[in-house]
Amino acid sequence: MLKGLSFHVKKGEVFALLGGNGAGKTTALECVEGLRRYDSGAIAVNGRVGIQLQSSSLPAHIRPLEAVRLFAEWNRVKADTATLAALGINSFAKKQYLELSTGQKRRLHLALALLGDPELLFLDEPTAGLDVEGRVSLHSQIRRLKAEGKTILLASHDMAEVESLCDRLAILKDGSLVFCGTAAELTAKSGSRYTISIKTEQGDESFFADNIADAMLDLLEGYRQKGIAVLDIKTDRGTLEQHFMELTGREQQ
């Protein structure tokens, strides 16, 4: 359930809906896409839209170029051969859909979403399930589309992906918006907060602290009183992912 969610996406930017499982990012994206009804509020979408769903699928025996032709006919548009070439569709054009790798399926569905040269793209977990090579390839395509002036709204749970691709992000927790802005603004929101990583004979632990000197003294005294030996201690101002976990109350994996 979404609760008072409000944000806007600027023309030509890559904007991420970020959150853990169940945070509401896919629900929010489906509302924007018109795939889910909402009880109150209003959504304005300005421009032609292309959609890539996380759970997209096609008939098992259809071939990529046949799928492109059919979708183009249904939507009364022409397929752009340059786009198909840029996405590498021709390299697996002779395969049936059931024979395609996850990465090839993602590229095919992105090609289908781009039919008709939409001004806006909605991508739901575009790199979920891809290996490193597939992720790098799809990230490259998203950057190319941004350079061409596309406005892209994507849902993701991957902070590294968001940091690499997006101009701004909205963080959702339990259906509510807890942050909206740039990655730099998210870091600044945490102020001077430090991350203290402590390695003991019983395992590793991490803590957040505003006053690092006092916090370290308190932590070390606490371990001493418990009779736990501290083997190593490190401090830093925290990664973007750590700021995200702090904001959403998630535990580091």
Mark where each language-model region is.
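Conserved ABC ATPase "signature" region
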Residues: 50, 69, 78-93
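A short, surface-exposed alpha-helical micro-motif characterized by mixed small hydrophobic
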Residues: 162-164
